[in-house]
Regions:
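A helix-coil-helix interface module used to build multimeric assemblies
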Residues: 2-105
Length: 105
């Protein structure tokens, strides 16, 4: 089915899309994925600060590099996470694998 105001899930993303467009940055699938990436990275940074085994990862440079993953998050990144999710059938696990891929670069 082709997307139009008549085939939208609700009037918010259909008829009122132009009035609610700014909300997409917070309530879209893309936003959900982006903020999940942010939460996972901030959790990891905090963990690295508290666990002696990970303490060497808690450098300022590493923190900046990690935060760059979500600060420069793109539509391509979200698409990659959806690709991973199609294999894992788990959205949060897909985010974890995506971050691991970024670590490996």
């Amino acid at each position: 089915m082709v997307f139009s105001t008549l085939t939208a899930i609700s009037p918010v993303d259909g008829r009122y899309r132009n009035k609610a467009e700014n909300l997409a940055a917070y309530f879209s699938e893309y936003a959900l994925i982006k903020y999940r990436v942010q939460v996972e990275i901030e959790y990891f940074i905090t963990l690295a600060e508290y666990l002696p085994q990970l303490n060497n990862l808690a450098t300022v440079e590493n923190k900046e590099a990690l935060r760059k993953i979500y600060k420069e998050f793109s539509l391509e990144d979200a698409t990659r996470i959806k690709e991973i999710e199609s294999v894992t059938n788990h959205d949060v696990k897909a985010v974890e694998y995506f971050i691991k891929e970024k670590f490996d670069l």
